[in-house]
């Protein structure tokens, strides 16, 4: 059974109980599909205060994470995960994480994630040890722990056996370059709003067509940039044209 090992270098290992103890990722850990280990740079300091940061050269606000504690933690993580493990630094300067990137990461046997804090980490550590830098969006967080958890969750969903239904990951938003279609469950009528009749018809071909059209329409309205990088089939073009026409006529 294929599995993924993820080691995280973080000042707050307790945060990752959200991954190991809850939801799909917890189930993956229990099934042996995901192995998660955290390494705290404070454990690799030698001074009384367990100092992991210092003032930046050149002045300026904030503090910068020191190289040595990070480097020593990385040595231990690589000893456990293997030298071939890909080292990833989560930072606003990285490439934006997309579903296609997640698919590539899910093919890995081992990942080592670096969760920075303060103003960031010493650039010399990045140059010497980091294979890839990834960002989860154009905004700033207090540290790399949440982005690391986002990456772990997204990758875990693609591990064979991690989801309850084999098709669930394939039907997620972005998997085929489109946003997801609307979903409904019981009751059929709520506050005078009805579930679309096509979903109650039992006609699987019509349902598939409706769902594809809704995905295309949502993507057109909310994330048109995704359509620019996707080649639409003849059926998809027709469905999108129908969607736009019906929307404009309503």
From Swiss-Prot:
CDD domains xref list: TrmD-like
Keyword tRNA-binding appears in the UniProt entry: no
Cellular location(s): Cytoplasm
GO CC, alphabetical: cytosol
GO terms of biological process kind: tRNA N1-guanine methylation
Residues that bind S-adenosyl-L-methionine: 116, 136-141
Record keywords, A-Z: Cytoplasm, Methyltransferase, S-adenosyl-L-methionine, Transferase, tRNA processing
GO-annotated molecular function: tRNA (guanine(37)-N1)-methyltransferase activity
InterPro entries: Alpha/beta_knot_MTases (IPR029028), tRNA_m1G_MeTrfase_C_sf (IPR023148), tRNA_m1G_MeTrfase_TrmD (IPR002649), tRNA_m1G_MTases_N (IPR029026), tRNA_MeTrfase_TRMD/TRM10 (IPR016009)
Enzyme Commission number(s) from the entry: 2.1.1.228
Main location: cytoplasm
Pfam families found in the cross-reference section: tRNA_m1G_MT
Catalytic activity: guanosine(37) in tRNA + S-adenosyl-L-methionine = N(1)-methylguanosine(37) in tRNA + S-adenosyl-L-homocysteine + H(+)
PANTHER family per record: TRNA (GUANINE-N(1)-)-METHYLTRANSFERASE
Biological role: Specifically methylates guanosine-37 in various tRNAs.
Entry similarity comment: Belongs to the RNA methyltransferase TrmD family.
Quaternary structure, from the entry: Homodimer.
NCBIfam families referenced in this protein's UniProt entry, alphabetically: PRK00026.1, trmD
Protein name (record): tRNA (guanine-N(1)-)-methyltransferase
Natural source organism: Pseudomonas fluorescens (strain Pf0-1)
Top-level taxonomy: Bacteria, Pseudomonadati, Pseudomonadota, Gammaproteobacteria, Pseudomonadales
């Amino acid at each position: 059974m294929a599995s993924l090992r993820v080691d995280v270098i973080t000042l707050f290992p307790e945060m990752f109980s959200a991954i190991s103890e809850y939801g799909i990722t917890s189930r993956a850990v229990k099934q042996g599909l995901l192995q998660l280990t955290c390494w705290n740079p404070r454990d690799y300091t030698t001074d009384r205060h367990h100092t992991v940061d210092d003032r930046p050269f050149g002045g300026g606000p904030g503090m910068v994470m020191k190289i040595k504690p990070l480097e020593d933690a990385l040595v231990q993580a690589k000893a456990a995960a293997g030298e071939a493990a890909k080292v990833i630094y989560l930072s606003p300067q990285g490439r934006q994480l997309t579903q296609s990137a997640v698919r590539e990461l899910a093919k890995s046997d081992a990942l080592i994630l670096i969760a920075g804090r303060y103003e960031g980490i010493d650039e010399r550590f990045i140059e010497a040890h980091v294979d890839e830098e990834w960002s989860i969006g154009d905004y700033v967080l207090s540290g790399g722990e949440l982005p690391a958890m986002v990456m772990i969750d997204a990758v875990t969903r693609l591990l064979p056996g991690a989801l309850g239904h084999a098709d669930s990951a394939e039907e997620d938003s972005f998997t085929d370059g489109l946003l997801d279609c609307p979903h409904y469950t019981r009751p059929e009528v709520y506050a005078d709003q009805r579930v679309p009749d096509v979903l109650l018809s039992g006609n699987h071909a019509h349902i598939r067509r409706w769902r594809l059209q809704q995905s295309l329409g949502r993507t057109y309205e909310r994330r048109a940039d995704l359509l620019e990088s996707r080649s639409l089939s003849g059926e998809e073009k027709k469905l999108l044209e129908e969607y736009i026409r019906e929307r404009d006529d309503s």
